[in-house]
Amino acid sequence: MPGTAEVQVRPGVEEDLKPLTDLYNHYVRETPITFDTEPFTPEERRPWLLSHPEDGPYRLRVATDAESQEILGYATSSPYRAKPAYATSVETTVYVAPGAGGRGIGSLLYASLFDALAAEDLHRAYAGIAQPNEASARLHARFGFRHVGTYREVGRKFGRYWDVAWYERPL
């Protein structure tokens, strides 16, 4: 697995659909990090991909191995809520491929994402982190997020309830 010097971060494109779906499905099947409980097909994920264009407030940034072009992770900004008054708020997520953790991929992705969002008319970014997840909490703290509350036992997956800690960051 490459170090961060051999990683490129770029906007997500249509050709990324299958590997991004495979990466996400790992988290669906194996972890409580996402509260989706059934894996997706690439076609089911296509609307998600298309909802993150190259510009605007809702972005998809993809980290790839510079040589092999293997996807190492991705970060998104998505609508926080559907109602119009929330339009200047986004929810951010970051997913790192199994085996690529601990190499700074998440930091590269978030740096790229927040650089891309700097020119947008946005006020706040929010991130929900299923607990426990110390690595994600540290990543978010490094990028200026602060813990604002925890929803207790808000989701049920794998036969148990999970808390979600919420973090916010000014943009």
UniProtKB/Swiss-Prot annotation:
Keywords: Acyltransferase, Antibiotic resistance, Herbicide resistance, Transferase. PANTHER family: N-ACETYLTRANSFERASE (PTHR43072), UPF0039 PROTEIN C11D3.02C (PTHR43072:SF23). GO terms for molecular function: phosphinothricin N-acetyltransferase activity. Belongs to the acetyltransferase family. PAT/BAR subfamily. SUPFAM superfamilies: Acyl-CoA N-acyltransferases (Nat). This is Phosphinothricin N-acetyltransferase. Residues 7-171 form the N-acetyltransferase domain. It comes from Streptomyces coelicolor (strain ATCC BAA-471 / A3(2) / M145). Inactivates phosphinothricin (PPT) by transfer of an acetyl group from acetyl CoA. The physiological substrate could be a structurally related compound.
